[in-house]
Swiss-Prot record:
Cofactor(s) listed: Mg(2+)
Organism: Mycobacteroides abscessus (strain ATCC 19977 / DSM 44196 / CCUG 20993 / CIP 104536 / JCM 13569 / NCTC 13031 / TMC 1543 / L948)
Pfam family, one: MraY_sig1
UniProt keyword list: Cell cycle, Cell division, Cell membrane, Cell shape, Cell wall biogenesis/degradation, Magnesium, Membrane, Metal-binding, Peptidoglycan synthesis, Transferase, Transmembrane, Transmembrane helix
Protein name: Phospho-N-acetylmuramoyl-pentapeptide-transferase
Catalytic activity: UDP-N-acetyl-alpha-D-muramoyl-L-alanyl-gamma-D-glutamyl-meso-2,6-diaminopimeloyl-D-alanyl-D-alanine + di-trans,octa-cis-undecaprenyl phosphate = di-trans,octa-cis-undecaprenyl diphospho-N-acetyl-alpha-D-muramoyl-L-alanyl-D-glutamyl-meso-2,6-diaminopimeloyl-D-alanyl-D-alanine + UMP
Length: 359
């Protein structure tokens, strides 16, 4: 628990202190965000707001993770784990893709950065590296960071995938989650606030898995997760980094996280879902992100097949703005929906444990 608190604390401090530095530097360099002309017109006043704030989020995550381990090692705790490093590496690789995308947008003064093919290739390569490595690094208990079995709140024994299919599954997960968070990042503080709650929920999930790990507490309801405590540290560092960034990103935003932040944070959800054996539970915890990407898919599918749109604009947070909702109203209500989804996800997680104990 000490390491979890330290990770969150360091991440908050680094993120909240580094972000204003980035605001000043990026403002001097003219690294401002371009705004879509077809979006809500009141968004045009945001043109020129510094972007690439995801750099501060990633810095907070790295500092929180390794800072907590430096303290932990001093008290005799284990160092970084394969699971934690893989999730952090996935987030960083995706953040790198996002950084290139953001930089091109800024240099060319347009709302489009990398072309779709280049961006997709970057995401796929990041996912492939993660998918292959997550089945390596077997520990003394025979556990690898990931499992080829599909999982809900623990592995589903009847649904096992060959290694190649599992890697493809990881690609789909990473692509889906990174794009889902990217689509959600369209209003001030929306994605950051939702991510803080989802990763906060993952702190609870992973700490519970640690307290009921099969390696230390064998039983019918124990969890076969390789490094649950270290994954809790990763989740706490991510939540802390998002909270620190949110101080400056809340409406009216002084800086945007950009694709640097949104792709990286989507990678965190994908990575945690695989390494904690909760791929299906993640859909509940991150239901708001799922709804955002589904709204985009529905909009495209409906327009291409019928010539009509389901929403006035997608992602659907803009739909509510065009209906007349104030931006802050949309943000707060979506935060509330995320809090409800996280509460439901945690209830399902704990309920499954109680049901297993009862059996």
């Amino acid at each position: 628990m000490r390491q979890i608190i330290i990770a969150a604390g360091i991440a908050i401090l680094v993120s909240i202190m580094l972000t204003p530095v980035l605001i000043r530097v990026f403002s001097r360099q003219g690294f401002g965000q371009e705004i879509r002309d077809d979006g809500p017109q009141h968004h045009q006043k945001k043109r020129g707001t510094p972007s690439m704030g995801g750099v501060a989020i990633l810095a907070g995550m790295w500092a929180g993770y390794f800072g907590s381990h430096l303290v932990g090692i001093a008290f005799g705790s284990d160092g970084p784990s394969a699971s934690g490093l893989l999730v952090l590496a996935l987030a960083t690789m995706l953040g790198g893709v996002g950084f290139i995308d953001d930089f091109i947008k800024i240099r060319k003064a347009r709302n489009l950065g990398l072309n779709k093919t280049s961006k997709t290739v970057g995401q796929i390569l990041s996912a492939l590296v993660f998918g292959v490595l997550v089945l390596q690094f077997r520990n003394t208990d025979g556990l690898t960071p990931g499992s080829p079995q599909l999982s809900y709140v623990r592995e589903i024994a009847t649904v096992a995938m060959p290694a190649a299919i599992f890697v493809l599954f990881c690609v789909i997960l990473v692509m889906s989650w990174s794009n889902a968070v990217n689509f959600t990042d369209g209003l001030d503080g929306l994605a950051g606030g939702c991510m803080a709650m989802v990763t906060g929920a993952y702190v609870i999930v992973t700490f519970w898995q640690y307290r009921n790990a099969c390696s230390t507490h064998p039983g019918i309801a124990c969890y076969n997760v390789r490094d649950p405590l270290d994954l809790a540290v990763i989740a706490a560092a991510t939540a802390g980094a998002c909270i620190g960034f949110l101080w400056w990103n809340a409406a009216p935003a002084k800086i945007f996280m950009g694709d640097t932040g949104s792709l990286a944070l989507g990678g965190v959800i994908a990575g945690l879902s695989v390494t904690t054996r909760t791929e299906l539970l993640a859909v509940v915890l991150g239901a708001l992100f799922v709804a955002e990407i589904v709204s985009v898919v529905l909009q495209i599918a409906a327009f291409r097949t019928t010539g009509r749109r389901v929403f006035r604009m997608a992602p659907f947070h803009h739909h509510f703005e065009l209906l007349g909702w104030a931006e802050t109203t949309v943000i707060i209500r979506f935060w509330l929906l995320t809090a409800i989804a996280c509460g439901l996800g945690l209830a399902l997680f704990y309920g499954e444990w109680l049901a297993t104990i009862g059996d």
